[in-house]
Amino acid sequence: MHRTSIVEELERHQQDQKADQEPGSVSDASNSALQESSDPRLSTTDNTNTPEINVNDQQQEQQVASGEDTDPPSPRMKTIVKPPPIKVVPPLNFGPVERNLYRSGQPEPISFPFLEKLRLRTILWLAVEDPSDNFLAFADDHEIVVHHLGLVTEGTNPWDQLTESSIVAALQIIMDRDSYPLLVCCGMGRHRTGTIVGCLRRLQGWNLASVSEEYRRYAGSRGGRALIELHIEAFDTSRIIVYPESAPEWCSS
């Protein structure tokens, strides 16, 4: 009896060892479960419904709550859709001669708003033909005196240059300050207007080279007329009487 119990005890011990070595045993299952729980890659937990947290959004909310400055929004470009109410368009060949003394071609209606800014008191019209009706109406509405000095007398050619008497009459008006602001003009603002301005420069003591350069600058790419330059050179400035008490301001400076 004693031997039999010892043999049975040995057999049971051997069977227990074999059972421990077989795969799928309880100990292996427990070990694998422990490995799965410790390794996050083997976890079967469903995380699809877990909300994501934006750290930047949290920081921005904290800045707003604490009153800290945040980046200002980018400025937007403003578009001007309303055009200027007045178009500033000077007349053809417009230019200043002296203070409150101007020259140009015949002004068109588009240039009338520009002329209004000059507050003209006198206009010397040097062309042979009469000024346009719109031009005369503009002068009448603004109480501007128009002197028509380009009229053709009997026996003269309308294509000839200004007469000596017309030049003297124009310069006497120019040398009177009561006529200012003043505009000297003709059809294109080139030759006849250039003659008056050239003789005025002679009266001011300009040298002939400077007088000719100014005349040709306004005469255009086709150049000036040699006869006009000779006429300016030969003009007798002693015929102009200048009264200091009534002379324009630029004359005494």
From Swiss-Prot:
One of its GO terms (molecular function) is phosphatase activity. InterPro entries: PFA-DSPs, Prot-tyrosine_phosphatase-like, Siw14-like, TYR_PHOSPHATASE_DUAL_dom. It catalyses: O-phospho-L-tyrosyl-[protein] + H2O = L-tyrosyl-[protein] + phosphate. Its main location: cytoplasm. The keyword Kinase does not apply. GO terms for biological process: cellular response to oxidative stress. Keywords: Cytoplasm, Hydrolase, Protein phosphatase, Stress response. It is found in: Cytoplasm. Its EC number is 3.1.3.48. It is an enzyme of class 3 (hydrolase). GO terms for cellular component: cytoplasm. It comes from the Eukaryota. The active site is at residue 186. Residues 93-249 form the Tyrosine-protein phosphatase domain. Residues 27-65 have a biased composition (Polar residues). Residues 1-84 are annotated as: Disordered. PANTHER family: TYROSINE-PROTEIN PHOSPHATASE, TYROSINE-PROTEIN PHOSPHATASE OCA1-RELATED. Putative tyrosine-protein phosphatase required for protection against superoxide stress. Belongs to the protein-tyrosine phosphatase family. This is Putative tyrosine-protein phosphatase OCA1. The lineage of its organism: Eukaryota, Fungi, Dikarya, Ascomycota, Saccharomycotina. The gene is OCA1.
